[in-house]
């Protein structure tokens, strides 16, 4: 017996079956860095149309978490796919480097500025700490396979960026959007600073809910307004509040002009009380107060009570009833306790009536020394003392512990207060900023589209933006204010330009070191330097100008895309929109894409206390970054993104399917040189031409999905192609031809040409997602090529040719369906132990006329499609009793074990085996492939 094994074209490749990604990816990263891969990509796109994705800067504090990974991987997929589409798509990563969290970390190390360390030294320590944090996060991001300008990222603490932030503020001022005011702002007593909207979280809190009586200064006259003459009891208006500590700042009682208000007399414990309440709430209030009996003495509209005076319950002054649109009857009494220094609505309505904006509370949440009754007490601890004083004064009608949603500091997780302080604001309405921003929102594409209505509502309802902070580590608000008039210096814009030039050379410390006389000369005595710093949301929100507008690789093109988590509608998307519109009248972006948050397999937020945190570092060390990247791409990011060990293992299974497909392609391109072996598409075997045509159609679908940022559709189509069209059909069928046909013959080279085209296309399809694996495939593909797939464009040689004589795509799809039915019957025969494998079978297909015409069209090559040694087609009417019905009404099948001898080389059972004297163990086909010109295949 001859050894025919050496006459077979066995698959061979250096591409291993196991990816071993956790170990191999770092080796690839070293090569990428050594070769300057990112710069190679940049050089390959010189002069092309730019596509600018601007990186929203993560905060330079702590290790990256799974949410960071999702964000960076999505950005990387977009940048790489846009590059593949021919764009010049630079990616400059950035970091947010100023602000309180860094200050707090540095304080733990060196103490607060002014104690053991000067403010200048403290800032330098903050700068060092932020740089260390950037280094740690950068290494983790690079490990994910994210390509970018990692050696020259943008940092908001770079001197040039700090200077540009100041320049952007000067433009906002020049355009008339800045004003100073005393306004209630979110204030964290632990931070000792104002908070931005985006720094506020809502959590449940238990507060004292109290009903407080404000007695009228002239009860008899007030009762008369309700139609009750000569009334002898004191009449009180009742408020309901959950912040007793704000009562020292009360300056009015707000009522609704349109509501009906009732004068109610009720008896309790032998005493008679007369109170004014919203009519619709009378019954609820009487129940709450434990009234033994009550009667409504009269009703009036709220507007009739405007400016009636009431005595403060424990301070020696009286306050007016005023009209406010913010009054509701959802809870309480229909009368709102109004403290303009401690509430936004209170402040707005107070401005209309010229009320004092009283703020008896210091930065640390403690009442100031001149606060009667409560000086030196912390506001939240004073709540009980306020309640006790009200009880003592006879003004407390009801008191209960009340659980409700309350604003908390996102850093300290502690309750915050509204507190009026002198601050700098960007006005939403003075120069029509709100109106302009809403108009720009309409010009922007929001993905998903619900993002538009979300940010519109936020802009419609947001107050002026308080951009000042009382911090040490931040970009200074570089203004000079007149010591007496508090007016800005008339040359503020030009002065800021000179200060910015200094900051560009020396950093923000230049402002603190600056002697005002250097810039103002003799005027210096009349002006003081502002010591406030900018809200860090201003830092990041101005980077479209301070970074994108300044760095040469962006070509002054402007930003095409912002991409962040859905919490950034009120964060970075909002601050960027406000600053850009204030500076230029235009939005800073053309598209805004948001992704959901990561949750565990049960839909819960990641939490160390629950123990469900999945660290990206652990995933890359165990499974590899490509598995994490595949999970990100395969997940519909428009909603919550579910991740768990089980889900990642499923991604690893999906990855193996793609890897195995790539390995099959490479292994079967062994010995193929496209320069001399490539068969023109029009000369290919019909099935090969179909495979190329199918790949061409799929490539269009994949490119479209990339363009629409639908990466989960890319992965779905890729998996379908690998598993069904290739794995279960095309690759399965061609194995016989690939392994047994003449090595240099047309039948094999046709097949290899199709595999080559598919591999060239597929390596590009996967490159944005499975970047490491794509690089690995690229290095092993035959033919002359550039060093990296990442400098390429989508494969152009997938010619979708259909010849007049060709079988249609529908034909092959029908054949795939028939093949699936045949496989079911063969599998049953194998389970019944009637045959060993499919090549041990002879199949008879009983088909109707239409199907018979299709099946017989490819003649004897039908058996190669069905992977059987023999395939006969007979009329459906001739079906035997042993024939098995299929899911196709037009087809019945009969499978029998073949009686023919088995060819030693191809394993097909053929009648002629044993009849060829020189090769008694071979079939005719194999002899032709060994000694002749090779078999002829037309169809499969």
UniProtKB/Swiss-Prot annotation:
Protein name from the UniProt record: Isoleucine--tRNA ligase
NCBIfam families reported for this sequence: ileS
InterPro entries: aa-tRNA-synth_I_CS (IPR001412), aa-tRNA-synth_Ia (IPR002300), Anticodon_Ile_BEm (IPR033708), Ile-tRNA-ligase (IPR002301), Ile-tRNA-ligase_type1 (IPR023585), Ile-tRNA_ligase (IPR050081), M/V/L/I-tRNA-synth_anticd-bd (IPR013155), Rossmann-like_a/b/a_fold (IPR014729)
Residues reported to bind L-isoleucyl-5'-AMP: 564
Motif placement: 'HIGH' region: 58-68
The UniProt record lists the keyword Hydrolase: no
Reactions accelerated catalytically: tRNA(Ile) + L-isoleucine + ATP = L-isoleucyl-tRNA(Ile) + AMP + diphosphate
Subunit structure: Monomer.
Gene it is expressed from: ileS
Keywords: Aminoacyl-tRNA synthetase, ATP-binding, Cytoplasm, Ligase, Metal-binding, Nucleotide-binding, Protein biosynthesis, Zinc
An annotated GO cellular component: cytosol
Lineage per the UniProt record: Bacteria, Pseudomonadati, Pseudomonadota, Gammaproteobacteria, Alteromonadales
Motif interval(s): 'KMSKS' region: 605-609
Binding of Zn(2+), residues: 903, 906, 923, 926
Pfam family, one: zf-FPG_IleRS
Cofactor: Zn(2+)
PANTHER family xref list: ISOLEUCINE--TRNA LIGASE, MITOCHONDRIAL, SOLEUCYL-TRNA SYNTHETASE
UniProt EC number: 6.1.1.5
Entry text on domains: IleRS has two distinct active sites: one for aminoacylation and one for editing. The misactivated valine is translocated from the active site to the editing site, which sterically excludes the correctly activated isoleucine. The single editing site contains two valyl binding pockets, one specific for each substrate (Val-AMP or Val-tRNA(Ile)).
GO terms of biological process kind: isoleucyl-tRNA aminoacylation
Family statement: Belongs to the class-I aminoacyl-tRNA synthetase family. IleS type 1 subfamily.
Keyword Cell wall biogenesis/degradation set for record: no
Domain of life: Bacteria
Residues bound to ATP: 608
Subcellular location: Cytoplasm
Cofactor stoichiometry and binding remark: Binds 1 zinc ion per subunit.
Function: Catalyzes the attachment of isoleucine to tRNA(Ile). As IleRS can inadvertently accommodate and process structurally similar amino acids such as valine, to avoid such errors it has two additional distinct tRNA(Ile)-dependent editing activities. One activity is designated as 'pretransfer' editing and involves the hydrolysis of activated Val-AMP. The other activity is designated 'posttransfer' editing and involves deacylation of mischarged Val-tRNA(Ile).
Annotated GO MF terms: aminoacyl-tRNA deacylase activity; ATP binding; isoleucine-tRNA ligase activity; tRNA binding; zinc ion binding
């Amino acid at each position: 017996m001859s050894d025919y094994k050496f006459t077979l074209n066995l698959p061979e490749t250096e591409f291993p079956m196991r990816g071993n990604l956790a170990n191999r990816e770092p080796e690839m990263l070293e090569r990428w860095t050594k070769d300057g891969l990112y710069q190679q990509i940049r050089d390959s796109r010189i002069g092309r149309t730019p596509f600018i994705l601007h990186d929203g800067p993560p905060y330079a504090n702590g290790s990256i978490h799974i949410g960071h990974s999702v964000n960076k991987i999505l950005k990387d997929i977009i940048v790489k796919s846009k590059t593949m589409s021919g764009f010049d798509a630079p990616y400059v990563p950035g970091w947010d480097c100023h602000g309180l969290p860094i200050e707090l970390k540095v304080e733990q190390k060196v103490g607060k500025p002014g104690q053991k360390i000067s403010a200048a030294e403290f800032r330098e320590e903050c700068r060092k700490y932020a740089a260390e944090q950037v280094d740690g996060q950068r290494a983790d991001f690079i490990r994910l396979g994210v390509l970018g300008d990692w050696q020259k990222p943008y940092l908001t603490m770079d001197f040039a960026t700090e200077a540009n932030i100041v320049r952007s503020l000067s433009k906002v001022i020049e355009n008339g959007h800045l004003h100073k005011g005393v306004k209630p702002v979110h204030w964290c007593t632990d931070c000792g600073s104002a908070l931005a909207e985006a720094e506020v979280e809502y959590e449940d809190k238990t507060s004292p809910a109290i009903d407080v009586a404000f007695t009228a200064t002239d009860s008899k006259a007030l009762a008369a307004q309700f139609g009750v003459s000569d009334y002898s009891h004191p009449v009180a208006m009742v408020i309901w509040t959950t912040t007793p500590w704000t009562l020292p700042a009360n300056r009015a009682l707000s009522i609704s002009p349109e509501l009906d208000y009732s004068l109610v007399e009720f008896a309790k414990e032998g005493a008679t009380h007369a109170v004014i309440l919203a009519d619709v709430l009378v019954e609820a209030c009487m129940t709450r107060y434990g009234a033994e009996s009550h009667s409504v003495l009269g009703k009036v509209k709220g507007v009739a009570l405007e400016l009636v005076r009431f005595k403060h319950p424990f301070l020696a002054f009286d306050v007016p009833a005023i009209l406010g649109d913010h009054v509701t009857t959802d809870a309480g009494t229909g009368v709102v306790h109004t403290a303009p220094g401690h509430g936004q609505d209170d402040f707005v309505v107070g401005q209309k009536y010229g009320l004092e904006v009283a703020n008896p509370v210091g930065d640390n949440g403690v009442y100031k020394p001149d606060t009667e009754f409560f000086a030196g007490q912390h506001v939240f601890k004073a709540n009980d003392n306020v309640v006790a004083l009200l009880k003592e004064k006879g003004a407390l009608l009801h008191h209960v512990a009340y659980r409700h949603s309350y604003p908390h500091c996102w850093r300290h997780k502690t309750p915050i207060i509204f507190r009026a302080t002198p601050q700098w604001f960007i006005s939403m309405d003075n120069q029509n900023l709100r109106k302009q921003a809403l108009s720009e929102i309409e010009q922007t594409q929001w993905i998903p589209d619900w993002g538009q209505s979300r940010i519109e509502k936020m802009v419609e309802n947001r107050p002026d933006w308080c951009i000042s902070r009382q911090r040490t580590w931040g970009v200074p608000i570089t203004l000079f204010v007149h010591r007496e008039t508090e007016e800005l210096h008339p040359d503020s814009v030009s002065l800021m330009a000179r200060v910015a030039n200094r900051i560009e050379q020396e950093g923000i410390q230049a402002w603190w070191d600056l002697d005002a006389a250097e810039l103002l000369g003799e005027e210096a005595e009349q002006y003081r330097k502002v010591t406030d710093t900018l809200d860090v949301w201003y830092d990041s929100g101005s980077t479209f100008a301070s970074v994108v507008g300044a760095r040469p690789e962006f070509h002054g093109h402007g930003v095409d895309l912002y991409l962040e988590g859905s919490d950034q509608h009120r964060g970075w998307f909002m601050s960027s929109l406000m600053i850009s519109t204030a500076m230029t009248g235009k939005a800073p972006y053309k598209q805004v894409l948001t992704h959901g948050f990561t949750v565990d397999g049960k839909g819960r937020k990641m939490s160390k206390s629950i123990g469900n945190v999945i660290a990206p570092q652990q995933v890359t060390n165990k499974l590899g970054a490509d598995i994490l990247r595949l999970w990100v791409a395969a997940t519909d990011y428009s909603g919550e993104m579910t991740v768990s060990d089980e889900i990642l293992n499923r991604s690893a299974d999906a990855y193996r399917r793609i890897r195995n497909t790539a390995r099959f392609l490479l292994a079967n391109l062994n010995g193929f040189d496209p320069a001399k072996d490539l068969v023109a598409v029009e000369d290919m075997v019909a099935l090969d031409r179909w495979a190329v045509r199918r790949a061409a159609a799929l490539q269009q679908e994949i490119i479209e999905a990339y363009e629409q940022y639908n990466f989960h559709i890319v992965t779905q189509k890729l998996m379908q192609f690998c598993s069904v069209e290739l794995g279960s059909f095309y690759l399965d069928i061609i194995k016989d031809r690939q392994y047994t046909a003449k090595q240099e013959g047309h039948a094999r080279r046709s097949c290899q040409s199709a595999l080559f085209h598919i591999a060239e296309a597929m390596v590009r399809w996967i490159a944005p997602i499975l970047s490491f694996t794509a690089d690995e495939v690229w290095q092993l593909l035959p033919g002359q090529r550039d060093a990296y797939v990442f400098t390429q464009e989508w494969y152009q040689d997938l010619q979708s040719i259909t010849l007049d004589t060709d079988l249609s795509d529908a034909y092959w799809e029908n054949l795939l369906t028939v093949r699936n039915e045949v496989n079911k019957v063969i599998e049953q025969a194998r389970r019944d132990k009637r045959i060993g494998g499919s090549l041990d079978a002879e199949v008879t297909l009983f088909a109707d006329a239409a199907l018979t015409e299709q099946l017989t069209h490819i003649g004897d090559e039908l058996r190669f499609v069905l992977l059987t040694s023999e395939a006969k087609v007979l009329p459906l009417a001739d079906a035997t009793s042993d024939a098995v019905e299929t899911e196709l009404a037009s087809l019945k099948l009969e499978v029998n074990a073949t009686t023919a001898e088995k060819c030693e080389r191809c394993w097909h059972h053929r009648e002629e085996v044993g009849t060829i004297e020189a090769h008694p163990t071979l079939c005719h086909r194999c002899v032709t492939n060994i000694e002749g010109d090779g078999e002829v295949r037309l169809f499969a």
